[in-house]
Amino acid sequence: MKNTQILILDFGSQYTQLLARRVREANIYTEVLPFDTSIEKIKEYPLLKGIILSGGPSSVYLQNAYKIDSEILNLDIAILGVCYGMQLLTQYFQGAVELADEQEFGKAIITIDDKKNPLFKNVTTESQVWMSHADHVTELPVDFKQIAHSNASIAAIAHNTKPIYGIQFHAEVTHSLQGKEMLENFLYDIAKCNKDWNLDDFIDQQIKEIKETVKDKQVILGLSGGVDSSVAAAIIGKAIGKQLTCIFVDTGLLRKNETIEVMKAYETNFDINIKLVEASDLFFSELKGIKEPEAKRKIIGKCFIDVFTDAARQHKDADFLAQGTIYPDVIESSSHGASSKTIKSHHNVGGLPEDLKFRLIEPLRNLFKDEVRQVGFKLGLPEEMINRHPFPGPGLGIRVIEEVTKDKVEILQEADAIFIKKLREWNLYNTVSQAFVTLLPVKTVGVMGDNRTYDYVVALRSVNTIDFMTATSTHLPWEFLDEVVNEIINKVDNVNRVVYDVTSKPPGTIEWE
């Protein structure tokens, strides 16, 4: 790779991916690696300009605290410790970190003590930041100075002679109002990175590599209808055309008319081979009687792999398997040791039998979701395909709460289609990050005409988010919601009540299951 590089060592912060995206947004290539990555591995990056130590949930003074290879600190590169990362630097350089009497969580104001420090170029003397720490630095490390403080703690430190910095706050979070400036100061002025990461070069490089790797062989790819697999198909198809065969599995758990729409979209926009596999009966049979969300996810994942495997075996001439894996999948599926606990299982990364012996092609594995969308636009994919809201791998199987049946899915499909249609009619669809309907496992009493009803409840959900790591509910117009509710009640059989979910993430997740 010809680009200058920044590495992020991950100690399990919920903001690590956001931190990586901020670096990418600065047109600098970055990768996230486990906190215990060896010095030998790090030296494999020839144009490495700096390392960022992420935040994390642990405490540096605990016996089993997460550590880095101390040789990293002897490299002739810039280093920035964020939150836990700053405390780790403090400990390595013989300072002191203790549990704070006055802990800081949320918005805080820091005061810059060293206005001439390059980290704070074009930053005001007082600046709002986002704090999330129970521990604090009580004694400066040797050869370091304090360059910023808050009411409760040392907020930033800098080495006297080396380009090593620590910040106690999360500059990557938008609540840190000048965090972008601080990060860019570190990247451009301290680490001396070039703005040389761009997606046009990425596309050209991927097409070249795919051609050189595949040559005259065949490739198969599992299509979901989502953005990731669509863009993966587009970039591979641009490289090798009809040598790519896409397999689309109809699980029965897709949105209303999705199978028809997806097949039409691919046939219209791609010069590739597409095969449809109808497997809904299998999925409904395997899900019968299953209520627990994680069990449903695993069953759906296994069924998909079994169906895809059977279809793949029919393509005996295929040497390569392509996947729409993106960088968050890679980060979350890697063993970081320090990483946050698994919240929900991912079923779409790996899992195919070893005897298939495919070689893997993952052209998007180094891109974040927003970058994938940009690549899709650059490749000429239609806007409605690229800007489609995210859809979970298990599909409506996790939007029907508890047991999934064909009848329940049909109810949900109708209600969801009305909600999405209305969002488009009101020109709201592209103003929200994700919107959908969930079918609840409860019935309520209602009145329809002169008759008593006892039918299901559906919940509308619409959120806005930058990165899907945190999200807030959308403040949709009351008149809009009233119109949606009326149409669902009047047109969807077996539903007599509609609620609107206003829970943020956290404490909730975006999906109900």
From Swiss-Prot:
<keyword id="KW-0547">Nucleotide-binding</keyword>
<keyword id="KW-0315">Glutamine amidotransferase</keyword>
<comment type="function">
    <text>Catalyzes the synthesis of GMP from XMP.</text>
</comment>
<dbReference type="InterPro" id="IPR022310">
    <property type="entry name" value="NAD/GMP_synthase"/>
</dbReference>
<dbReference type="GO" id="GO:0005829">
    <property type="term" value="C:cytosol"/>
</dbReference>
<feature type="domain" description="Glutamine amidotransferase type-1">
    <location>
        <begin position="5"/>
        <end position="196"/>
    </location>
</feature>
<keyword id="KW-0436">Ligase</keyword>
<dbReference type="InterPro" id="IPR004739">
    <property type="entry name" value="GMP_synth_GATase"/>
</dbReference>
<dbReference type="InterPro" id="IPR025777">
    <property type="entry name" value="GMPS_ATP_PPase_dom"/>
</dbReference>
<dbReference type="GO" id="GO:0003921">
    <property type="term" value="F:GMP synthase activity"/>
</dbReference>
<dbReference type="GO" id="GO:0005524">
    <property type="term" value="F:ATP binding"/>
</dbReference>
<feature type="active site">
    <location>
        <position position="172"/>
    </location>
</feature>
<dbReference type="InterPro" id="IPR017926">
    <property type="entry name" value="GATASE"/>
</dbReference>
<dbReference type="InterPro" id="IPR001674">
    <property type="entry name" value="GMP_synth_C"/>
</dbReference>
<keyword id="KW-0658">Purine biosynthesis</keyword>
<dbReference type="InterPro" id="IPR014729">
    <property type="entry name" value="Rossmann-like_a/b/a_fold"/>
</dbReference>
<dbReference type="InterPro" id="IPR029062">
    <property type="entry name" value="Class_I_gatase-like"/>
</dbReference>
<keyword id="KW-0067">ATP-binding</keyword>
<dbReference type="Pfam" id="PF00958">
    <property type="entry name" value="GMP_synt_C"/>
</dbReference>
<keyword id="KW-0332">GMP biosynthesis</keyword>
<feature type="active site">
    <location>
        <position position="170"/>
    </location>
</feature>
<feature type="domain" description="GMPS ATP-PPase">
    <location>
        <begin position="197"/>
        <end position="388"/>
    </location>
</feature>
<feature type="binding site">
    <location>
        <begin position="224"/>
        <end position="230"/>
    </location>
    <ligand>
        <name>ATP</name>
    </ligand>
</feature>
<feature type="active site" description="Nucleophile">
    <location>
        <position position="83"/>
    </location>
</feature>
<dbReference type="Pfam" id="PF02540">
    <property type="entry name" value="NAD_synthase"/>
</dbReference>
<dbReference type="InterPro" id="IPR022955">
    <property type="entry name" value="GMP_synthase"/>
</dbReference>
<dbReference type="Pfam" id="PF00117">
    <property type="entry name" value="GATase"/>
</dbReference>
<comment type="subunit">
    <text>Homodimer.</text>
</comment>
<comment type="pathway">
    <text>Purine metabolism; GMP biosynthesis; GMP from XMP (L-Gln route): step 1/1.</text>
</comment>
<protein>
    <recommendedName>
        <fullName>GMP synthase [glutamine-hydrolyzing]</fullName>
        <ecNumber>6.3.5.2</ecNumber>
    </recommendedName>
</protein>
